[in-house]
Amino acid sequence: MAIEDLFKIVKERFVAEQPAVPASQEGDVEIPQDLLFKCPRCGAVVYNREFTAAMKVCPKCSYHARLTWQERLELTADKDSFVELDAGMKSLNPIGFPKYEDKIAKMQQQCDMNDAIKTGVCTIRGYRTVIGIMDSHFFMASMGSVVGEKIARAFEYATEHNLPVVMFTASGGARMQEGIISLMQMAKTSGAVKRHSDAGGLYISVMTDPTTGGVTASFASLGDIILAE
């Protein structure tokens, strides 16, 4: 027997005796979503309770995860102080975009909101404030007729009652399913901000991930104070 054949026999026997690796152990380790969080930027793995306690900021690289409107409200407003404005406002599919109603209904169920923004009145450390929170989980918080109208009405309410406005922006831009109507919201919201400013009102704009497109080009960039998360 040649020496090469001997090594071949030993190799085949060794490979045959290796225990099979379960499919669940191949590749990346699956992380239970309710227990651990894996940072998409640096790959660090932390306990979810620690991640949540840190306002969903990675302790290793300071990556900011996107928050829901409920999480943002809980972090900002005094407990049980929030009263929603225009709670029943919903889109009527103004240009008849195919299956738009079905997509909206699905987002409403998933995100517990009628459209991509929640507006209302609350207190922040005791100070009465009009607040708006955009949620990127709802259609990437794109600005359509409902979002624009709710923002405009929030500023009008603040102007009428001499209140400051804090707006948390997060948007992928205009909502294509509503066509030109979505672009009109840029002028509408900017006009409402201007009237609030002319009346002496304070407006704080907090830009969060992602703030892009028509939202950036309109009310998000018009704050007396602009903060970027």
Task: Give the ranges of each region predicted by the language model.
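Terminal-region recognition feature
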Residues: 1-204, 210, 222
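Gly/Pro- and small hydrophobic-enriched strand-loop and loop-to-helix capping segments
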Residues: 223-229
